[in-house]
């Protein structure tokens, strides 16, 4: 089923309601990181260029639903957009019963979570939102995995529901990486716990040629291989699960490589002294915080031979430089690769920034939870809604 794209529609004189992900950090009334706002600008500008009267909505932070709280107001976002766009931008606080908006103007709705029923995808609220527009545009990949009134319900009731350019780009990039990838397909999955990424690991292990695990997740696989992990973070109750994943990978001709050398310390702190050890020499009081240089080189070789790379999660505690060399080497290998690469997840994007490889990654996903759910093979509620409306 085809999804309607905003870029294909005639929007002249139309009231267009765009759901963006404008959930940005704010301090003292000022936006402190504008990445999501910058990402949304081309969609808003395209709607204006097509002659639309533009309304934009988003959540910001986690206010108590149904209650106004100035701390979570969209006003700082409005101030930012007013400078970034060459047109009038204003905040609408009371909009559910109708809002005046002229062609060439942008009205930003107050935080959608101030509306009772937003998170539960309340039908009455969804219908009120839908009545405000001629065209609803879902452009917030970061919230596409949530079935809420502003991301899902409104689209079911609006006259037309379509995907914005940012969402369309995300789906195209993820489809290119997972549905029809250039092989070998290599996935790097890091993070602290196997339990939070278990479904991702299971889903990917069935489609990738090589699965690489890092961070705390790797510790559970190290333990599953029979090595001591000392006081490292790992999940003893998931050792059998890790063994099963390795056996599955090997039955398909792949593997989940375990590090041969690791970087350990006696405590978790920015000043902890790093010690390099072979994986079979980890002591009872050691904590594993990174992979060693031999392991990093082995992973870099795997990445060099890849046709497609999916990266979700660092392989060490890269926030502390003495435990960042493994992630740095992985980042460099991805940057040097000619393969199609996609990176997603908050920690991953922080590593991309730290090692300055943003322009060397083919596509950087804006979604955290949505990116993970896509990797799990789930259909995102917003995508299901857009397919339904495009049919």
UniProtKB/Swiss-Prot annotation:
GO MF terms, alphabetically ordered: ADP binding; ATP binding; phosphoglycerate kinase activity
Domain of life: Bacteria
InterPro entries: Phosphoglycerate_kinase, Phosphoglycerate_kinase_CS, Phosphoglycerate_kinase_N, Phosphoglycerate_kinase_sf
Record's subcellular location: Cytoplasm
EC number(s) stated in the UniProt entry for this protein: 2.7.2.3
Cross-referenced HAMAP family: Phosphoglyc_kinase
Protein name: Phosphoglycerate kinase
Lineage of source species: Bacteria, Pseudomonadati, Pseudomonadota, Gammaproteobacteria, Alteromonadales
């Amino acid at each position: 089923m085809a999804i309607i794209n905003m870029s294909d529609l005639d929007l002249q004189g139309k009231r267009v309601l765009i759901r963006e992900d404008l959930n940005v950090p704010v301090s003292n009334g000022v936006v402190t990181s504008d990445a999501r706002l910058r990402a949304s600008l081309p969609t808003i500008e395209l709607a204006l260029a097509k002659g639309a009267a533009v309304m934009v909505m988003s959540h910001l932070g986690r206010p108590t639903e149904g209650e106004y709280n100035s701390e979570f107001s969209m006003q700082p976002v409005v101030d930012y957009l007013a400078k970034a766009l060459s047109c009038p931008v204003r905040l609408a606080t009371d909009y559910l019963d109708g809002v005046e908006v002229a062609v060439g103007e942008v009205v930003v709705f107050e935080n959608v979570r101030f509306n009772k029923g937003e998170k539960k995808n309340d039908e009455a609220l969804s219908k009120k939102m839908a009545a405000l527009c001629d065209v609803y545009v879902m452009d917030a990949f970061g919230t596409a995995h949530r079935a809420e009134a502003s991301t899902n319900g409104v689209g079911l009731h609006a006259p037309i529901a379509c995907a914005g350019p940012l969402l369309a780009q995300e789906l195209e990039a993820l489809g290119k990486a997972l549905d029809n990838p250039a092989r070998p397909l290599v996935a790097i999955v890091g993070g602290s716990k196997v339990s939070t990424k278990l479904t991702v690991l299971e889903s990917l292990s069935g489609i990738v040629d090589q699965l690489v695990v890092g961070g705390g997740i790797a510790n559970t696989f190290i333990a599953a291989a029979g090595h001591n992990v000392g006081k490292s973070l790992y999940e003893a109750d998931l050792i059998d699960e890790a063994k099963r994943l390795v056996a599955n990978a090997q039955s398909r001709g792949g593997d989940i490589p375990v590090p041969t050398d690791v970087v350990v310390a006696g405590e978790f702190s920015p000043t902890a002294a790093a010690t390099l050890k072979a994986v079979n020499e980890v002591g009872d009081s050691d904590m594993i915080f990174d992979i060693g240089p031999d392991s990093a080189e082995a992973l870099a070789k795997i990445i060099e031979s890849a046709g497609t790379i999916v990266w979700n999660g660092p392989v060490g505690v890269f926030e502390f430089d003495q435990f960042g060399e493994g992630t740095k080497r992985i980042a460099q290998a991805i940057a040097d690769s000619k393969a199609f690469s996609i990176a997603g997840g908050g920690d991953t994007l922080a590593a991309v920034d730290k090692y300055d490889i943003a322009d060397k990654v083919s596509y950087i996903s804006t979604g955290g939870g949505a990116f993970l759910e896509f990797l799990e093979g789930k259909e995102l509620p917003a995508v299901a809604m857009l397919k339904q409306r495009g049919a």
